Every structure is written in structure tokens, then in C-alpha cells.
Amino acid sequence: MILLASKSSGRLATLRTAGVEPRVRVSSVDEEAVLHELTQRRRTAGLAAPSAAEQVQALARAKALDVAASTDPQDAEVIVGCDSMLEIDGRVVGKPVNAADARERWRTMSGSTGTLHTGHFLVRAVDGAIAEGVSSATVRFGSPSQTEIDAYIASGEPLGCAGAFTIDGLGGAFIEGIDGDPHGVVGISLPLLRRLLADLG
């Protein structure tokens, strides 16, 4: 039994489509605090700011471990934590904070190419064994009109998604192509999940 440490409807739907019916328990992790701690640790060590892949992996780890700490091994075999961020135009962004932020994101994304990173962190409940990895895919954005962007934002869909877009919903019409695993762009990579589960045995 998989316990999904995420409230993402896209991740849940992806697993269900693949024949997996997970339980869901949302973590109480303070994402900003996790990223701040990661940045401070690297700065103290004289290292560069964390990459997008390092950021999503840190968040996926924090979410999975938070849920694992309060999970009885009889309730789940594996806890799965995920987090996604879009890297575009030299910036790394998660969910937009409001409609104005989403609109500004689309001004940057329109006609451009970005990389969607999704971190995966698995914890085996019985003994705490872990497996982790990052799925990254290149996303080529179309050039929707301002009217289309306004209507899309008014739908509310992009406000709950990393990068302010989806490929499995209304936003799919504005995506010209993807190089990489489309499931990873939705929020959970099925091929990577399979490999990580195999690593755990």
C-alpha cells in the first residue's frame, strides 16, 4: 500500500490511472522554511545556491519524512513524497501566489521553453529505508493571447500548479510539446517511481 504525502489531484489521478489506489495524507511541512534551511546550509558550506533539482528533492524528502514519522507500518508499506518546480528564464518557481503572479508567469512562459523538475522521495515504513530521484522534462510553451491567458487564470486551475500550468487539464492547450516524461510534468513520474520501488525491494 502506497501512502501519498501530497494533496495534488494530478498525482493522485496519475497513480489511479496506472492501477494504484494510494491512501493520501498531506504533510504539514513549512516549504519556505525547508528551502531557507537548505540555502543556509549550502551558504555555510561555501556552496552555490541550491539548484532547482536540489530544491524539489529537499521538499519531497521533507514531506515524505514528515508523514512517515506519524505513520504506523501497518497502515502503509511505502510513503511517497513529491514536489515540483519550473525552471525558466533563470528563475525557479513553484505555485503562483495569486492571479497577478500567474499572469506575470505566463508573460515569461509564453513562446518560451522551461524545465519542470519533480523530486521523488520514498520511505519504507517498516524500517525507514529510502530511495529518491528527480524527474526533469523540457516544456515548450505556446503563445496564448492575453484573452486566453485571462480566461485560463480566471478558471483557477493554474493557481494550484507549479509553474502556473497543467498538461492534463485546461492548460494542455497552451503546451506545444514535452521532451521527457509527461507524468513527471503532471507531478509524479511513473517510470521513476517504478525504479525507486524496485530499489527498495
Regions found by a protein language model. Name each.
Residues L59-V67, R105, I149, S189, ...:
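Short, well-ordered amphipathic alpha-helical segments that serve as non-catalytic structural scaffolds
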Residues V78, S84-G114:
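Active-site-adjacent loop/tail segments of enzyme domains
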Residues A99, R103-G111, G119-E132, S136-A137:
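Anionic-ligand binding region
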Residues L38-T44, E87-I88, D127-S135, I178:
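Acidic/polar active-site rim loop that often engages polyanionic ligands
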Residues M1-G19, S112, D127-A129, S136-G201:
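GST superfamily/GST-like fold recognition
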Residues M1-V78, D199:
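N-terminal polybasic phosphate/anion-binding patch
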Residues R91-V97, V134-G142:
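Short beta-strand and adjoining strand-loop segment in the mid-core
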Residues L15, A60, D83, A102, ...:
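Residue-level signal for inorganic ion chemistry
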